Amino acid sequence: MKTPHILIIRFSAMGDIAMTVPIVYSFAKQYPDVRISVLSRPFAQPFFQHLAPNVDFMAADLKEEYKGFRGLNALYRRLVAKQFTAVADFHNVLRTRFLRLRFLLDGKAVAHINKHKQGKKLLCREENKVFIQQPTSFQNYADVLEALGYPIKPEFTSIFPAEGGDLQLLPNIIGVKQPSERWIGIAPFAAHAGKMYPQEKMELVVRKLTEKHPSWRIFLFGGGKQEIEILNQWAAQYPQCICVANVLKGLEKELILMSHLDTMVSMDSANMHLASLTGTRVVSVWGATHPYCGFMGWQQKEEDAVQINTLSCRPCSVFGNKPCHRGDFACMNNILPEEIIQRIEEGLL
């Protein structure tokens, strides 16, 4: 009998790809005789390269080598050579539908994600919201596998061993955590204004943390020229801070550092999910979006989510990319820096 070989497809975005990891890991552990190949963008390789013996990673650059219709046909020919027995589409967009259809016409079993868009639409509409927790992305991914005949029980702690990633692979400036220290990560940025705590207020969080806890070290996470400039200003002003982008190159090394943090402070953004993959507690800050949309980090606690629950307009967006109905972004602006600091301290003192 032919060994089952399952293709799992998820191309973007980073946070969504990260959320596949607990499900892929659980699948691999509970079905050790099944071969699993994850098809994604090249940057995602560190998520999967050491995940389980029966998991391998396939990179596909959709902007270069596999661009456009001709590129997708070339990608399909590459995939067919692997002799997959079934395809799990964790993305369900135009590109993946094309690939899925080709496999279906070739007689392969296929299944795709249900994103529950209607429920999210009712949750985020301006009036008469239906305020119900939507299925999480983790559950949605697991449902795809179940449709292919592989029900799983999600079980995952970290991509690293219990002691965390190997700090010796990082530059000396990171060092070794001393008994008196707490290591705090702060990732203050997000793709959209509705998901980002105001910069001046987040700097207050940094300043007050350094004043209250002089033995704590703060690692600032961000990418892109403008973000790094802001983080460098903070690092210059507050000696306990390090701009991670200046000293660590590559996602794998950032994940190693995250695995040794006591707490990560993040928006509803990719860094929440990256830290979750390392088993690190995340204090998440929510504005226009809401955990009920189903994107809370893996095994993160609702009590660690900082949000204003008295605003009837929340959530107004699934992704935080819509203009504020009120015009004042009260969902973020009305969160006090002290609330975030208190939430950080509650888990550490």
Q: Each predicted region: which residue ranges?
A:
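Catalytic machinery of carbohydrate-active enzymes
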Residues: 1-349
